Curated annotation (Swiss-Prot):
Name of the protein in its database record: Arginine--tRNA ligase
Gene Ontology CC annotation, any one: cytoplasm
Broad EC category: ligase
Species for this entry: Chlamydia muridarum (strain MoPn / Nigg)
Gene responsible for this protein: argS
EC number from the UniProt entry: 6.1.1.19
Similarity comment: Belongs to the class-I aminoacyl-tRNA synthetase family.
Superkingdom per UniProt: Bacteria
Self-association state and partner proteins as the record states: Monomer.
Subcellular location: Cytoplasm
Record's keyword terms, sorted: Aminoacyl-tRNA synthetase, ATP-binding, Cytoplasm, Ligase, Nucleotide-binding, Protein biosynthesis
Entry's Gene Ontology BP terms: arginyl-tRNA aminoacylation
């Protein structure tokens, strides 16, 4: 769908070319108006052109406006030094809503779908998922949903840590304690901690662990059998969390790339990209002060080798057009080095294919890194369980008469929605404060606020005995609240574009929060049932319902018919 922003950009671009043909190409600065009384959109380019054209911004604005057709607008005004304020006509907005309703059902398909690989979540085998995995899982899932919605072919990869020294330690510990049936073990994480202590304190244990790493890499049957059982137990616990979060992933761990590591190093050497540094094989880049080490001095490979092999495989075998890796911002330098290496080797054809989607920390209410009182990472399973229980407490407080059956159904939805929305509504680059009290509020920019607006629409349907609301048909706009709601609905595809361009879900959460506020104002100001404009207003309700439902789905949130 052609968004209002792209439509207006095209008009202004054409007008500037006609008014000032001597100008070279320029990037236009057109934005939604900051205040409603300024109109719908604002063009600020007259100020930028003043120096090049040696004219006043206002005179430039007047010439631009003279070349813009008046038909789609109710007004085009020049304000201040040369701001051009555009207000679309009500008839134009009504016609655009007809197109919007059709495109919304299809998902605003892109003209050139791509193969997009999104690598996210990626916990380590034999360790509990903790709050640090929450952001990667939630952000990655949201981006995957958005890319899929507009028609891209998305592969969701879980690059789990299923190889390395840790497994040598675990296998050795299990052999020592004669525990060969891992499925009988309740807490693999505790075993890992015990094995880690032995590894650090007992040189003989460390030696046997290193031997078992080699045995595992060589395909020793006993070592492989134990490794497979360890992975199966861990993946089962991961899947429990993914089911709660309603997240789908295809597991392709680090071990998958083992057969390709030697060839990757050899290929980089053949391209004269490798330098020996203290016995280690490294790839140096002029723009970075440190290299990417791809083979240790003892001949072993590391996670950087695996990442290079994974990048090559995803381009050459998966035929990816874009690759996103969602991890904390602390790994930014590593991924810059990885991209530079893969570009130099030709594994990435050009810049822009790969993006590291970094994110900040989760903090407690004191502004410290979110941990237990003893300083350990908070287990994600415990965090989700607590969210569900606190959501149930909130429901009991607001509805003392709620049945246990309703509580059991609604509690998990409200709790998980709250956690997801609180995370996604924060700019992913920023740290954010985790507060159950704030995220479970019924007012403000919360999941509960979105859900309340959606439930209000369901109430309209029940009260008027309607199974569904109209999402197409003739529409006339009469009241300011109708016009504002129509304009907000039409901004959904451009917000989706922005979310995908910047890889930032908070643009979508901000939009949905604004939409709920505009709908609530419409509901307050515009009588629906029995009014002269009942059908048109039900149409606006129907489009709001579908847009809210779609937006919440893209965030990974679930809806309810009542609260």
């Amino acid at each position: 769908m052609t968004t209002l922003l792209s439509f207006l950009t095209s008009l202004c671009s054409s007008a500037i070319r006609q008014a000032f043909p001597e100008l070279e190409e320029l990037t236009l600065d057109i934005t939604p108006s900051t205040k409603e009384h300024f109109g719908h959109y604002q063009c600020n380019d007259a100020m930028k052109l003043a120096r090049a054209l040696r004219k006043s911004p206002r005179a430039i604005a007047e010439e631009i406006v003279a070349h813009i057709p008046a038909t789609p607008f109710s007004s085009i005004e020049i304000a201040g030094a040369g701001f051009i304020n555009f207000t679309f006509s009500k008839e134009f907005l009504a016609n655009q809503l007809q197109i919007f309703s059709q495109e919304l059902a299809k998902g605003f398909p892109v003209s050139s779908p791509q193969k997009v690989i999104i690598d996210f979540s990626s916990p380590n085998i034999a360790k509990d998922m903790h709050v640090g995995h929450l952001r990667s899982t939630i952000i990655g899932d949201c981006l995957a949903r958005c890319f899929s919605f507009v028609g891209h072919d998305v592969l969701r990869l879980n690059h789990i840590g299923d190889w390395g020294t840790a497994f040598g330690m675990l296998i050795t510990y299990l052999q020592e304690t004669a525990q060969t049936d891992i499925h009988q073990l309740e807490n693999l994480t505790e075993l890992y901690k015990k094995a880690h202590v032995r590894f650090a304190e007992d040189p003989e244990f460390k030696k046997r662990s290193q031997y078992n790493v080699v045995a595992l890499q060589s395909g020793d049957p006993q070592a492989l059998a134990l490794w497979k059982q360890i992975c199966a137990v861990s993946e089962k616990s991961f899947q429990k969390i993914y089911s709660i979060l309603d997240v789908e992933l295809h597991t392709r761990g680090e071990s998958f790339y083992n057969p390709f590591l030697a060839d990757v190093v050899s290929d980089l050497e053949s391209k004269n990209l490798v330098t020996l540094s203290d016995g280690a094989k490294c790839v140096f880049h002029e723009e970075f002060s440190i290299p990417l080490m791809i083979q240790k001095s003892d001949g072993g490979y590391n996670y950087a080798t695996t990442d290079v092999a994974a990048m090559r495989y995803r381009i050459q075998q998966d035929h990816a057009d874009r690759i996103l890796i969602v991890t904390d911002s602390g790994q930014s330098l590593h991924f810059q080095l990885l991209e530079a290496t893969c570009l130099a080797a030709g594994y990435l054809p050009h810049k822009g294919i790969f993006s590291h989607v970094g994110f900040g920390l989760v903090l407690d209410t004191q502004g410290r890194k979110f941990k237990t009182r003893s300083g350990e990472n908070i287990k994600l399973q415990e965090l989700l369980d607590t969210a569900i229980e606190k959501a149930k407490e909130s429901l009991r407080e607001h509805r003392p008469e709620i049945s246990e059956e309703e509580l059991a159904y609604q509690g998990p939805i409200l709790g998980i929605n709250a956690i997801k929305y609180a995370d996604l509504s924060a700019h992913r680059i920023n740290d954010y404060v985790f507060s159950f009290e704030k995220m479970l509020r019924f007012e403000g920019n919360t999941a509960m606020s979105l859900l309340y607006a959606y439930v209000r629409i369901q109430g309209i349907k029940r009260r008027m005995k309607l199974d569904t609301l109209p999402q197409k048909g003739p529409l006339s706009i009469h009241e300011p609240a109708e016009e504002t709601l129509a304009l907000t609905l039409l901004r959904f595809p451009e917000v989706l574009d922005l979310t995908l361009r910047e890889l930032c879900p908070h643009f979508l959460t901000d939009y949905l929060y604004v939409l709920t506020n505009k709908f609530n104002a419409f509901f307050r100001d515009c009588h629906i049932e029995g009014s002269d404009y009942q059908q048109e207003r039900l149409y606006l309700c129907g489009l709001t319902e579908k847009t809210l439902e779609t937006g919440m789905h893209l965030l990974g949130l679930k809806t309810l018919d009542h609260l």
